[in-house]
Amino acid sequence: MFIDTSELCDLYAEQVDVVEPIFSSFGGVSHFYGKVTTVKCFESNGLIAEVLEENGEGRVLVIDGGGAVRRGLIDAELAQLAVDNGWEGIIVYGAVRQIQQLENLDIGIHALAPIPVSADESSAGESDIPVNFGGVTFFPEDYIYADLTGIILSQEPLDLED
């Protein structure tokens, strides 16, 4: 279903938080939404891989990588895993790699920047905890909506038929 974050902001101005415009789109899908699942990690993506093994239908993975852009937390292999398991999208407060492959996958991916260096594969980090970046706090079970214009967050699902 097509979403327009500008229209959603107009309709639900009092209900949504707007993430600061620091992200770029790298995936093959320009707009996506779903229930938030969080991971907090630093320059490692083992825990991300574990979470992406889960059924992602109706879910968006929000990764707090501390804003670090020295290593790509998502690469083509992890993005394909997300597609295979039905994830709607991935938001990375950090870097991604293998951009040419990411843009051909059927998933939305927003991140700070691309870099060719891979993350380490340790499972260090935490999941399903509140994370804060971009001027908002993301709680597991919140709802996130993203397109090329921006990213918004709501505690309740928004009626996309309005």
Curated annotation (Swiss-Prot):
CDD domains given in the database record: RraA_family (cd16841)
Where this protein primarily resides, as one coarse class? cytoplasm
Keywords carried by this UniProt record: Cytoplasm
SUPFAM superfamilies per record: RraA-like
Q: Which GO terms describe its molecular function?
A: endoribonuclease inhibitor activity; enzyme binding
Q: Name one GO biological process term.
A: regulation of RNA metabolic process
Gene Ontology terms, cellular component aspect?
A: cytoplasm
Q: What does this protein do?
A: Globally modulates RNA abundance by binding to RNase E (Rne) and regulating its endonucleolytic activity. Can modulate Rne action in a substrate-dependent manner by altering the composition of the degradosome. Modulates RNA-binding and helicase activities of the degradosome.
> What's the family?
Belongs to the RraA family.
This one is known as: Regulator of ribonuclease activity A
**Lineage of the organism:** Bacteria, Pseudomonadati, Pseudomonadota, Gammaproteobacteria, Pasteurellales
